[in-house]
Curated annotation (Swiss-Prot):
Membrane-topology descriptor: Single-pass membrane protein
Keyword terms: Host membrane, Membrane, Transmembrane, Transmembrane helix
GO cellular component: host cell membrane; membrane
Main location: host cell
Species per Swiss-Prot/TrEMBL record: Haemophilus phage HP1 (strain HP1c1)
Compartments (UniProt record): Host membrane
TM region(s), chain numbering: 10-28
Name of the protein this chain belongs to: Uncharacterized 13.1 kDa protein in lys 3'region
Domain of life: Viruses
């Protein structure tokens, strides 16, 4: 009679020990998984911060280049209009075989000096 209880007790302790070790193993596994997830989250946050900084830098550079392009286009339009006005001047219509008129020369010289 006592032998059966002792065997049951040993069996119960063995099962309890296996379940206890399983719980510890499971806990350690999930702890490691949580640490890995936290590390990945931290890396993702750092990447997001870097991307925001890069985006801000890009937007600043884009605005600056757009402004420069708009200024260059405005100057080109002004120069084009000035050249049209000079070439449409009646005095400057026929100078193919003669000397370049002063108005035209001034426009062309100004273009080379602006570079």
């Amino acid at each position: 009679m006592f032998g059966g209880i002792m065997e049951f007790k040993a069996l119960f302790i063995g099962v309890f020990l296996i379940v206890f070790l399983g719980c510890i193993g499971s806990t350690l596994h999930y702890k490691k998984q949580a640490e890995t997830t936290a590390l990945l989250l931290k890396q993702s946050e750092q990447t997001i911060k870097q991307n925001k900084v890069m985006l801000q830098r890009y937007e600043t550079q884009n605005a600056k280049l757009t402004s420069q392009l708009n200024q260059a286009n405005k100057k080109a339009e002004q120069r084009s209009q000035q050249l049209k006005d000079v070439l449409n001047n009646a005095e400057n219509k026929n100078w193919t075989y003669g000397r370049v008129p002063n108005d035209v020369a001034g426009v062309l010289n100004h273009r080379t000096q602006a570079k």
